[in-house]
Amino acid sequence: MTFKRIASSIQQDRLSNLPDVLLIMIISCLSFKECIRTSVLAKRWRYLCRETRNISFKETEYVDHFVSDKRSKRVSFAAYMCQWVSRYHGRYIETLEIYFSIPSDFLAAVESLIEFAVSRQVKNLVLDFSDPSWISTSCASRYDYVCVQLPVCVYSLTTLESLKIYSCGFDPSKFSNSRLPRKLSIGWIKLTDVESLLLNSPTLKSLSINYCWGIEIRNIAGDMKEFVFESCDFSSFMVCCFDLPNVEIFKYSGQILSFDVKRMNMSIKDVILDFTAEGLYEDRNQRTKLEGSVLSAFLNNLRGARTLSVCPYLLQTIQECEDPFDLLRPMETQHLVLRTRLHVMEFKGIKLLLDNCPNLETLTFDIFSRSLFSYNKSYYGVGPRSYWKKNLTYKSLPKTLKVVVVRNFTGRFGELNVLKFLIQSGRGRWPGREHGPMLERVELYMDSSMAESQKELADDGAMMLQSISGDVQVLVYDP
């Protein structure tokens, strides 16, 4: 429901007979910005927004970081937040969000806002004091300290269900077993004591660690349903052991460690693996062979994933696995997402995954920025134009494959080669096709930022695919 719809309803007198308690429930479903706007609709609505149960203060909506008087704007923003909560009429709140970058000069205001949330028995608390300009841990780690520490009153709050703290210090030992929220997200801080947090967290169902540094963690265990580890820096190379028998969503993005898996849910719903932080390489070496074995073994422990998303680095390295014990085994994956440059150095990795996904129904190519590597040269005997014809037949494809999706489609020959093969094999251009895959459609999503000349190339490629598609639908989405 949007602000315009509510305004239209009021004009037609559709809401005038509803009691205030229901109107408050309705406006609590709006974004905080739209909720505030309802105060100008009519006299009756003037103060209803003061009882919304979802409050969100975002500095970026109030302060233009490019203006000369940024300091005075931040002072005004802090005063606005304190004034707003001082006039709040409700007894309880569901959510309080504070997005205020490095508020070192406003600590008293921030603490009073948090105390307000605790007094209203908040369920979901977001404290994000990171700088929007930070793009990596190296940007944030230059600060020797975090200016805001989580107040003592938060640790004992029994109503808290979800806590997000970015660039905000906290003491894991102060959370008792019964007081830790079910969902915890930590980011943009030096984090050295994760294991003590996990040892005392039987109620924790979702843990997200993002852009932290100095991490020392060797065992990740618990009854969690969701685990996210994104773009963190470790204090040293280490063995990282996972014991997550009930996890349903698993996302790991960052450095390659010596991964060990004790237990993993064999019916896991969603797995995302991203090792692009390792960079790119053109020549194989002893390190890449070792990492190929590590990642192949890691995939085997995650082979129950219904949806699996992988990165170019994984596609390139898993083909280098030489240890028979770690060679890729058949997986249960039904939706495979390949984040790829469609470079020849990734082709064998793509084939390995296709060969080991016998239940695959949807194949997605998520194509992102091209590298400086040449797309016309071969890579250890793999040719960019001939590989798909020489190394794949209809027998290589999962018999269950129904949908192929291409995101950021550009119509370049690398994309067209693999799509031509998939379409031709799916529509019956191969001998013995009656036992082959049953491809139903190909979905092409163009990038809205493409130049006109690039768009023309993509249009030509899409038309060519449509001309050979037969019974296979080729759908083009041009934003």
Swiss-Prot record:
Residues 12-60 form the F-box domain. InterPro entries: F-box-like_dom_sf, F-box_dom, FBL13/AtMIF1-like, LRR_At1g61320_AtMIF1, LRR_dom_sf. The keyword Repeat applies. Keywords: Leucine-rich repeat, Repeat. LRR repeats lie at residues 99-129, 139-167, 186-211, 228-254, 287-312, 342-367, 419-446. Pfam families: F-box, LRR_At1g61320_AtMIF1. Gene3D superfamilies: 1.20.1280.50, Ribonuclease Inhibitor. This is Putative F-box/LRR-repeat protein At1g56400. It comes from Arabidopsis thaliana. The lineage of its organism: Eukaryota, Viridiplantae, Streptophyta, Embryophyta, Tracheophyta.
